[in-house]
Amino acid sequence: MAKRCALTFKGPMVGNHVSHANNKNKRRSLPNLRSIKIQLDDGTTKRIKVAASTLRTMRKGA
């Protein structure tokens, strides 16, 4: 299952863990996904995964 927002398509970012000795190890920063139910035009409900930042924007009404 992809760790990606269904609306904004935000996905994992790649970065480095950097130690005091300046050694670098790869790390993944995953999006904060939440499972929500959304009602479609035909009246059925569907469960999708949405990033928390997208959910805040939806609730704000912007």
UniProtKB/Swiss-Prot annotation:
Annotated GO MF terms: structural constituent of ribosome
GO biological process: translation
GO cellular component terms given for this protein: ribonucleoprotein complex; ribosome
Disulfide bonds: none
Keywords in alphabetical order: Ribonucleoprotein, Ribosomal protein
Pfam families associated with the record: Ribosomal_L28 (PF00830)
PANTHER family membership: 50S RIBOSOMAL PROTEIN L28, LARGE RIBOSOMAL SUBUNIT PROTEIN BL28A
Entry-linked NCBIfam families: L28 (TIGR00009)
Protein family according to the UniProt entry: Belongs to the bacterial ribosomal protein bL28 family.
Protein's name in the database: Large ribosomal subunit protein bL28
Taxon lineage: Bacteria, Pseudomonadati, Campylobacterota, Epsilonproteobacteria, Campylobacterales
